């Protein structure tokens, strides 16, 4: 039998120390990685529950194991809340991650070798949208679209031209590094013109969509996938949604998730999703998402005033790309310099980037995490000022030390977990 007094620190101090150091890092660093966020203690409680012990292959009411009556309730709660949150007719809460959700959709709707049309990774897409290093680019014939070189927005004319030329079986909308509003209706129009499925990967903007501050792709896409962390602020996991009304597609999706791509679901993570979905249904969640966008816009305004180039000219969501080509600063060096000052970002390729993905000429910056800890426009502008100070004085240790001290002081005023 296990005593509930058992803990990691007494048994494995080396691991406990690493975990404690990560807690300290999160509290004393400003987190600007657009795909990261802080989940609530309720979400972490669910993930650390005894539900982790239960195997439950199958779906609620149709399991391959006994003793699933309680996890059936848990999963159905998550399904029902996901449907309510996004206005969906169908929801599968079992995918372990966004990539697994995308893989399941590919397997459900395509055959190996079929053509897919997705956004280029170097222009803001995701690995699973047809990158040659990913299953989506290895198993399928991937064609890639990008941004209009003049406006920095999605080049819908190119999407349409490529669709007519290559006749893809599926078109993918969505992104990992694009700061504009996507015209989901236009994507569906193009998909219908060539008889293609439309898959929308809304992983980055799911929280914004749930709160009604970003267009919902459900009325337009055949299938929508997402992660459940990022702007949604839940556990690190995946979700498949649809409102297409085609029961045959829903059946294919379920079979593709299990047994096609996965075995048993992670019941403790599904419980955490159920909690996160209920949190996202609360009125304060909309206010949070509105502040996420306001903070991103505030940061952009400061950086533009300081002479920095923002891809697409600004932001309408939670993230933006800082183009450093004209500053002759690599994304790798900028990332390291900011990290030394307790500001965490990620290097990112920018359109027409002359440098490799391991070096890059840009930074991706996001506001979900700083907003989650309570930052408003005032603090967001201060953070942007610090970033510019460091980038304007690359290699100046005195600037880094000064900013680091000020960052720690600000973080102390806005603890993540009190």
Curated annotation (Swiss-Prot):
<dbReference type="GO" id="GO:0035999">
    <property type="term" value="P:tetrahydrofolate interconversion"/>
</dbReference>
<dbReference type="GO" id="GO:0004372">
    <property type="term" value="F:glycine hydroxymethyltransferase activity"/>
</dbReference>
<dbReference type="InterPro" id="IPR015424">
    <property type="entry name" value="PyrdxlP-dep_Trfase"/>
</dbReference>
<dbReference type="GO" id="GO:0030170">
    <property type="term" value="F:pyridoxal phosphate binding"/>
</dbReference>
<dbReference type="InterPro" id="IPR019798">
    <property type="entry name" value="Ser_HO-MeTrfase_PLP_BS"/>
</dbReference>
<comment type="pathway">
    <text>Amino-acid biosynthesis; glycine biosynthesis; glycine from L-serine: step 1/1.</text>
</comment>
<keyword id="KW-0663">Pyridoxal phosphate</keyword>
<keyword id="KW-0963">Cytoplasm</keyword>
<comment type="similarity">
    <text>Belongs to the SHMT family.</text>
</comment>
<keyword id="KW-0554">One-carbon metabolism</keyword>
<feature type="binding site">
    <location>
        <begin position="125"/>
        <end position="127"/>
    </location>
    <ligand>
        <name>(6S)-5,6,7,8-tetrahydrofolate</name>
    </ligand>
</feature>
<dbReference type="InterPro" id="IPR049943">
    <property type="entry name" value="Ser_HO-MeTrfase-like"/>
</dbReference>
<dbReference type="InterPro" id="IPR001085">
    <property type="entry name" value="Ser_HO-MeTrfase"/>
</dbReference>
<dbReference type="InterPro" id="IPR039429">
    <property type="entry name" value="SHMT-like_dom"/>
</dbReference>
<comment type="function">
    <text>Catalyzes the reversible interconversion of serine and glycine with tetrahydrofolate (THF) serving as the one-carbon carrier. This reaction serves as the major source of one-carbon groups required for the biosynthesis of purines, thymidylate, methionine, and other important biomolecules. Also exhibits THF-independent aldolase activity toward beta-hydroxyamino acids, producing glycine and aldehydes, via a retro-aldol mechanism.</text>
</comment>
<dbReference type="InterPro" id="IPR015421">
    <property type="entry name" value="PyrdxlP-dep_Trfase_major"/>
</dbReference>
<dbReference type="InterPro" id="IPR015422">
    <property type="entry name" value="PyrdxlP-dep_Trfase_small"/>
</dbReference>
<feature type="modified residue" description="N6-(pyridoxal phosphate)lysine">
    <location>
        <position position="230"/>
    </location>
</feature>
<keyword id="KW-0028">Amino-acid biosynthesis</keyword>
<feature type="site" description="Plays an important role in substrate specificity">
    <location>
        <position position="229"/>
    </location>
</feature>
<feature type="binding site">
    <location>
        <position position="121"/>
    </location>
    <ligand>
        <name>(6S)-5,6,7,8-tetrahydrofolate</name>
    </ligand>
</feature>
<comment type="pathway">
    <text>One-carbon metabolism; tetrahydrofolate interconversion.</text>
</comment>
<feature type="binding site">
    <location>
        <begin position="356"/>
        <end position="358"/>
    </location>
    <ligand>
        <name>(6S)-5,6,7,8-tetrahydrofolate</name>
    </ligand>
</feature>
<protein>
    <recommendedName>
        <fullName>Serine hydroxymethyltransferase</fullName>
        <ecNumber>2.1.2.1</ecNumber>
    </recommendedName>
</protein>
<dbReference type="GO" id="GO:0019264">
    <property type="term" value="P:glycine biosynthetic process from serine"/>
</dbReference>
<comment type="subunit">
    <text>Homodimer.</text>
</comment>
<dbReference type="Pfam" id="PF00464">
    <property type="entry name" value="SHMT"/>
</dbReference>
<keyword id="KW-0808">Transferase</keyword>
<dbReference type="GO" id="GO:0005829">
    <property type="term" value="C:cytosol"/>
</dbReference>
